[in-house]
Amino acid sequence: MKRCQSSRPTAAVAAVVAAVSMIIVLVSGTAIPSAAAAAAVEHTFVVSQVNMTHLCKEMAFTVVNGQLPGPTIEVTEGDSVTVHVVNKSPYNLTIHWHGVYQLLNCWNDGVPMITQRPIQPNHNFTYRFNVAGQEGTLWWHAHDAFLRGTVHGALIIRPRHGAASYPFPRPHREVPIIIGEWWEKDLPQVDRNMTNGYFDDYSSGSTINGKLGDLFNCSGVLEDGYVLDVEPGKTYLLRIINAALFSEYFLKIAGHRFTVVASDANYLTPYSTDVVVIAPGETLDAIVVADAPPSGRYYIAAQPIQAPPPDTQTPEYATRGTLQYSSNSRNSSAAAMPEMPHQHDTMRSFYFRGNLTAGARLHRHGRRRVPARADESLFVTLGLGSVCRHGGASCKRGGNLKESIVVANVNNVSFHIPAAAATPILEAHYYHRLHAGAGEEEEELAERPPRAYNYTDQALTPFGPEEMRLEATSRAVVTRRFRHGATVDVVFQSTAMLQGDSNPMHLHGHDVFLLAQGIGIYDAARDEGKFNLVNPPRKNTVLVPNLGWAAVRFVADNPGAWLMHCHFEFHLSMGMAAVFIVEDGPTVDTSLPPPPEDF
C-alpha cells in the first residue's frame, strides 16, 4: 500500500530561521563555538504555523522551526544555553525547560503569568540558563493553551567527561523517542473548551517522533511510521519522552528488551524489562541491544493506558514504528508485533514504578541524599469539583453546565492563572507585593483538605448528588510558601472524583524523592514505614496512581515561584495546580537575583 509521508520544514521557514539566527549572532557579536570546546550553546526557535496533512485532513499546526517534534537541544553538563524565541504564531506562548533546575534563575522557567508575561505574536524573547549538575534526558515545551501538543522537543545533557563516563556500557548510538498525540483540532480552542467545563475533545491518534504509523490510513493509504535502523549486536540508548497531552503509555519492541538506566535525568539501578511505562512529562533512558535475528523486522508499539470500566472510557489509539536491521533494510516482509499489556492493566504501571530505585551515581555533582525527616508535611487531594459560572456565589452544582463549571482542584481549591493584566507571581513575590495583581484572589494551599471523606469511594462522581455533598470548590491563585532549606513531604492522594485518571504531578525547579506509592487511602501510621529512605528514585514528575497515593520529599532550596501541577494538560487547564514559593536564604548565594536587564 502507499504511504502518507510526513511533512517537512518549508523553504520559507528554513529561510526565516537562518536569517534570524544570523541577525542574532551579528548583534550579539558572538560566534557559536564548536561542539567539542563549547561552553555556550545557542539556538533560535521560530514559532510559526505550517500546514500538515494526515488522516485525509490538511490543517495548520503551530511548531518550532517548521518541524514536529521541534529541534533537539544537545548540551554538555555545565554548559550555558541561550534560546532566542521568535513568535510568528497567532498565539501568546512561553517555552518551559522541563526538568532544568534553573538554580537562582526562576525568571527563565518559562511559565505564563507565573514567571513571566507570555510572548505575544510578532514579539521575541530570549531565554538564558545553565545545565549544571544534571545529566540525562529532559525536554522543552510550550506552556500555554495546549500548544505543547505540537511545540516540544528533546533536551539532552551529556556528561562533562564524555560518553565513556556513563554508569552503563557506552552505547553505539543515542536515539530520542518522543511519544505524542495527533489532534485534528485547534489546540488553543480545546484549552478554552476544557477551561469552561466542556470535555468533548479527543486526539485522533498517537505518534512516535511525530509519525502516526501504519495503524492509521487515509482512504487506504497508510500513514508514514518512524523507522529505527540498527546494526546487529550494537547497543542503543533510547531517550524516551512522553509529550502527550492526555495519556500514559506502554512502550514495547518485539523481540527486544529494555534496560532502564535513568528517569527524569537521574540515574537508576539498571532494571531489565520487556515493556516500559511512561506518563506525560516523564522521561526514561533505556538501553536496547540489537540482538534479535537481523533478517526480521520488529514493531515498536506505544499503547495508551486507561483505567477499566466503570471509570470513564475515552478514545485511545495505539501507534507503532519499526525497528529494522541495516543489513536487511530492503526487507519488506511483515514486521513482528509485540504482545502488549491490556490497556486497562494499570497495575502493570504501578509495579513498573515500584521497581525503580536510585542508581549508585545519584550523588554525583554533590547531590544530597534523601533527608531523614521532614520539617513540614502536606496531604494534597487531587479531585474534581464545580464553581458557579460568571462569579456567582450560589448555583446548582453536580454537572449543571448552565450554572456551574466542572474544575480540577488540589485540597478543594482550583488554581486560577492570573489575568494577563495582572503582575506575574514571581515578580509580585520578588518586589514584595502582597497580591499577584489587582482583582486576583489568592488562597494558601492548606496542609490538608477542608474535610476528610472516603477519597476512593467509587460511588463519588462530579456529576451527581454525591458531589453536591462536598464543599463547593473555590477558585483562586493558589500558593504555598516555604522557608529556604526546609525539607517538605507531600502526599498526593488521588480521589474517585477523577473517574479513573492517574495524575503525573510535576514540580518545577526541583527534583523530588519518590518515597513510596500505594493503592487506596494513605494512612500515615501504616504507610510511613514503607518509605524508602535508602535509594528512592529522584524525579521531577511523579505519577499518582488511580485510586491511590504517592509520597514525595524535597528540599526547598531554590528561591522563586515554582509551578506544581498535573501534567495531563486538561487537568492543568481545569485547575489542578499550585505555586510553591521558596523564600530567599540568608546569603546572596541563596537568594533570587533581580530579573535580567532585558527581561
Curated annotation (Swiss-Prot):
Main localization of the protein described in the UniProt heading: secreted
Signal peptide positions (record): 1-29
Binding site for Cu cation 1: H96, H506
GO molecular-function terms, A-Z: copper ion binding; hydroquinone:oxygen oxidoreductase activity; oxidoreductase activity
Documented EC number(s): 1.10.3.2
Amino-acid positions noted as binding Cu cation 4 in the UniProt annotation, renumbered to this chain: N503, C566, H571, M576
Binding site for Cu cation 2: H98, H141, H567
This protein's GO CC annotations: apoplast
Binding site for Cu cation 3: H143, H508, H565
Annotated compartments: Secreted, Extracellular space, Apoplast
Residue positions with a glycan: N51, N92, N124, N193, N217, N331, N355, N412, N454
Family: Belongs to the multicopper oxidase family.
Name of the protein: Laccase-15
Species per Swiss-Prot/TrEMBL record: Oryza sativa subsp. japonica
